[in-house]
């Protein structure tokens, strides 16, 4: 599979700080057993970035964070 780059993800979430937060939150969800939205055998962090680059996951991840 092709490598994922930050530039691919920045097309979906232009702010790199928000991108890092969204990817971190999604990777934690995947590590805890949530179902991935794309087919991949990669680690949760890579799957999270692939989902963001594909437009499957976005800034809505930050709105789901419990306070």
Swiss-Prot record:
HAMAP family: RNApol_bact_RpoZ (MF_00366). Its EC number is 2.7.7.6. It comes from the Bacteria. The keyword Transcription applies. InterPro entries: DNA-dir_RNA_pol_omega (IPR003716), Pol_omega/Rpo6/RPB6 (IPR006110), RPB6/omega-like_sf (IPR036161). The RNAP catalytic core consists of 2 alpha, 1 beta, 1 beta' and 1 omega subunit. When a sigma factor is associated with the core the holoenzyme is formed, which can initiate transcription. It catalyses: RNA(n) + a ribonucleoside 5'-triphosphate = RNA(n+1) + diphosphate. SMART domains: RNA_pol_Rpb6 (SM01409). GO terms for cellular component: DNA-directed RNA polymerase complex. Pfam families: RNA_pol_Rpb6 (PF01192). One of its GO terms (molecular function) is DNA-directed RNA polymerase activity. It comes from Burkholderia multivorans (strain ATCC 17616 / 249). Promotes RNA polymerase assembly. Latches the N- and C-terminal regions of the beta' subunit thereby facilitating its interaction with the beta and alpha subunits. Keywords: DNA-directed RNA polymerase, Nucleotidyltransferase, Transcription, Transferase. This is DNA-directed RNA polymerase subunit omega. GO terms for biological process: DNA-templated transcription. Belongs to the RNA polymerase subunit omega family.
């Amino acid at each position: 599979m092709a490598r994922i780059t930050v530039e691919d993800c920045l097309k979906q979430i232009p702010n790199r700080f928000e991108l890092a937060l969204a990817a971190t939150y999604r990777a934690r969800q995947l590590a805890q057993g949530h179902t991935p939205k794309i087919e991949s055998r990669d680690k949760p962090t890579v799957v999270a970035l692939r989902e963001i680059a594909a437009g499957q996951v976005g800034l809505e991840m930050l709105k789901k964070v419990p306070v």
